[in-house]
Amino acid sequence: MTILIRADEAETLSASGVTLLADMTDTDGHLTSHRSIFQPGKEGAPPHLHREAAELFFVLKGSLRVLTGEDLIVLGVGDFLHVPPNTPHAFEAAGDEPAEVLFVLTQAKPRFGYYRLLEGAYRGETDWAEVAATSGLYDNHYVESSAWQQRSLENKEVRL
């Protein structure tokens, strides 16, 4: 089935900077996709992993600092990254400009409910503990990462 989502028809979650494009239920279970804008100085996503889903990143504007495993890398405009299942990862804008990124998750569970829940947390309407409690439902499992915690203290970034 062919799917077309016009820019002016996509649902945008303003507090979190997420634009919902297509979910698993829209693509016959093939993929879910969204676009996110990350503001400088604000963490985009804390360390987490997906047990079932692979996550693809494509940077449209700005640059994105990404944890993948225990490595920190910086992606620039036009860079593509594939993070396989069970790989801890996190991300945020790198530098002084917002980062705009297209995400595609394959083999994923439907995720739009997760992004709407996050939107509520960013607005202060949902407790963050409620977000964490949905890890099994949305295949979003939060993990600890010393590399991510120390990212501002060490210069371990590698330009791809």
Residue spans for each PLM region:
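Short acidic-glycine-tyrosine-enriched beta hairpin
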Residues: 4, 70-88
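A short glycine-rich, His/Asp/Glu-containing loop-to-beta-strand
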Residues: 10-47, 53
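Short beta-strand segments
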Residues: 45-47, 68-73
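Acidic/histidine-enriched, glycine/proline-rich intrinsically disordered or flexible terminal extensions
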Residues: 116-160
